[in-house]
Amino acid sequence: MNALKTTHDAKAPIVAFDMTPATLRELGLQESDVPEVHAVAQRIEVGSPQTVAEFGRDVAEHTSRYADSLLDQVRNSDLDEAGEKLTQVVAKARSLNVGPLSDNRSRLPLIGPLIDRFRVRSTGFMARFDTTREQIEHLVSEVQTTQQGIAQRNASLDEMFAAVREEHRLLGVHIAAGKVRLAELREQAEGLRGNVGNDPGRVQELADLDAMVANLDKRIGDLIALQHSAMQSLPTIRMIQANNQMLVDKFHTIREITVPAWKRQFMLALSLNEQKNAVELATAIDDTTNDLMKRNAALLHRTSVETAKENQRLVIDVDTLKQVQTTLIKTVEDVIRIQQEGVQKRKDAEKQIAAMRGDLQAKLTRQPVRELAQQESV
């Protein structure tokens, strides 16, 4: 009891929530919303904490409805797919390099293969260009479909923008209603606090009312945060729409200006390269003719000189005869030396054999050791 009185003495005077035009503007409301504010405030019933817990739930349901509806229409990968396809268009365009049409040709001795090589290379490149052009047109068609989806998405984002604005307004209504009801409950709690006495029922009623006031104050704070989040969503939606529109415009530029201009430039480059190749072909033909004449003259000189040298040459060269004679003399000398060495080796072998034979006979004619011992004992 004393504690309750002390708390009452410490509290500041209660100020009723005044819905002035300035206050309403801060909450995103107008004077026409005041009746709705009072109607929403009456939903909070004294002695029913559940009404505080459910306060503002209809706003969440409103948000969930339009968010789910948009999510059913939106695929997060749409923008990624559009960007990926545009990247593929650029990659395909860059893959067509007109450089191969003007590569340096090898100098061939015959004119026919040179012309054939030029024709095959040009034909192959044109076939490659046709294939790449078909791929680019297919990718452009796919991106155009995605672009139409993005344009429709912007219309859905307009609906989302309107829904978020309505959410912001509804949150403002609930915040104002909550503050109105909060001031009333606080005033009611202060009145009860002064007459609580020693009645346990009144004490509990006051405690429940204080708890309800605290919960409602917390709920109002949450709604204020949600309203600010909704307000932040509005410029976010507009930025997304602006990005979508820039992507749509960029694709229009690529499809209607860039790709046709690229095709025209490619055809111009192809024509210029054909002219360049024609000049290079004529130059290559002239170079081949001059090179052929030079090589024929050099070949004539080489064969004539070699023929004259062969006609003045002896059947057998003197150097060959000298080498043959030197080899023959060396062969005779080597044979004689080998024969002499063989005679000497045989003589040495006979001497060694005779010595071994004498040694063997001497060993065989010697008396045994036992007989020598008997002779010594006698």
Curated annotation (Swiss-Prot):
Single biological process term from Gene Ontology: response to tellurium ion
Keywords associated with the record: Plasmid, Tellurium resistance
Keyword Signal in annotation: no
UniProt cross-references to Pfam families, sorted A to Z: TelA
InterPro entries for the chain: Toxic_anion-R_TelA
Keyword Glycoprotein in annotation: no
Function: Belongs to the kla operon, which is associated with cryptic tellurite resistance, and IncW plasmid fertility inhibition.
Family that this chain belongs to: Belongs to the TelA family.
Protein name in UniProt: Protein KlaB
Source species: Escherichia coli
Lineage: Bacteria, Pseudomonadati, Pseudomonadota, Gammaproteobacteria, Enterobacterales
